Amino acid sequence: MIRTMLQGKLHRVKVTHADLHYEGSCAIDQDFLDAAGILENEAIDIWNVTNGKRFSTYAIAAERGSRIISVNGAAAHCASVGDIVIIASFVNMPDEEARTWRPNVAYFEGDNEMKRTAKAIPVQVA
């Protein structure tokens, strides 16, 4: 059996740009991509914490150290500058591998300041 697992996640990054007329994609600081193990041109899901919208696009690399999160093209209808979003990528793998798999997670605060990275997501009770 093949399972689809969380590969990498940027947790609570802030949208810095939204360009409706750009070709598409989401430009992400290369340091952030590296931290989450997301590759340029990889499919990503974006979950907008601010407005509840969920959408898919692909990642492109923004300048390393820029802290840019730029939602482009039609996806710009789903996010505005200042919105808090979660960006995730997924990977398919055999069941045996999936049982021990740990995703790459980067946590952010403020103006896209990376606070820490982890290989697990802690259980939280609401």
From Swiss-Prot:
InterPro entries given in the database record: Asp_de-COase-like_dom_sf, Asp_decarbox
Cytoplasm listed as a keyword: yes
GO cellular component, one term: cytosol
Enzyme Commission numbers on file: 4.1.1.11
Residues modified as Pyruvic acid (Ser): S25
Cofactor(s) the protein needs: pyruvate
Stated family: Belongs to the PanD family.
PTM annotation: Is synthesized initially as an inactive proenzyme, which is activated by self-cleavage at a specific serine bond to produce a beta-subunit with a hydroxyl group at its C-terminus and an alpha-subunit with a pyruvoyl group at its N-terminus.
Catalytic class of the enzyme: lyase
Pfam family, one: Asp_decarbox
Active site (UniProt): S25, Y58
Binding site residues for substrate: T57, G73, A74, A75
Catalyzed chemical reaction(s): L-aspartate + H(+) = beta-alanine + CO2
Single GO BP term: alanine biosynthetic process
Name by which UniProt lists this protein: Aspartate 1-decarboxylase
Annotated localization: Cytoplasm
UniProtKB keywords: Autocatalytic cleavage, Cytoplasm, Decarboxylase, Lyase, Pantothenate biosynthesis, Pyruvate, Schiff base, Zymogen
Function: Catalyzes the pyruvoyl-dependent decarboxylation of aspartate to produce beta-alanine.
